[in-house]
């Protein structure tokens, strides 16, 4: 007989109970939230006295910054400003291209007018 006997030998574990008998695991997330009331709202936290809220995949300051303007509003205005600057740059480029095209056609027109005048002069000399 061993010194410690069968005290240290692992015993067989009892078989596990079957999986959950409820059908909640087969429901989609929104239905489960309605059934179980799992609507937690948006996550918020405080860091160094500043309140942050998780919106659209980013942590956004929930508090109002100096001057009474909301941080989300300033972000929206910056984004709109950048869009307008890009549009303005595109329009300037289009104007430059149109001016180049106009100067090219004007130069061609002047050359053709000059050539036509020369042909008229040579035609008069022949007569």
UniProtKB/Swiss-Prot annotation:
Residues 1-25 are annotated as: Disordered. Keywords: Cell projection, Cilium, Cilium biogenesis/degradation, Coiled coil, Cytoplasm, Cytoskeleton, Differentiation, Flagellum, Golgi apparatus, Nucleus, Phosphoprotein. GO terms for molecular function: beta-catenin binding; protein homodimerization activity. The modification Phosphoserine is found at residues 9, 20. Residues 77-98 are annotated as: Leucine-zipper. InterPro entries: Chibby_fam. Homodimer. Homodimerization is essential for nuclear localization and interaction with KPNA4 but is dispensable for interaction with CTNNB1. Interacts with polycystin-2/PKD2 and GM130. Interacts with the C-terminal region of CTNNB1. Interacts (C-terminus) with TCIM (C-terminus), TCIM competes with CTNNB1 for the interaction with CBY1. Interacts with FAM92A; this interaction facilitates targeting of FAM92A to cilium basal body. Interacts with CIBAR2. Interacts with KPNA4. This is Protein chibby homolog 1. It comes from Mus musculus (Mouse).
């Amino acid at each position: 007989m061993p010194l410690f006997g069968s005290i240290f030998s692992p015993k067989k574990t009892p078989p596990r109970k079957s999986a959950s008998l409820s059908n909640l695991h087969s429901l989609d997330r929104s239905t489960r939230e309605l059934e179980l009331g799992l609507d937690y709202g948006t996550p918020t936290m405080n860091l160094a006295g500043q309140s942050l809220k998780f919106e659209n995949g980013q942590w956004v300051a929930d508090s109002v910054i100096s001057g009474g303007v909301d941080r989300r509003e300033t972000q929206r205005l910056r984004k709109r400003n950048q869009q307008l600057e890009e549009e303005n740059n595109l329009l300037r480029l289009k104007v430059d291209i149109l001016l180049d095209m106009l100067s090219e056609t004007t130069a061609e027109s002047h050359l053709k007018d000059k050539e036509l005048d020369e042909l008229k002069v040579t035609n008069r000399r022949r007569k």
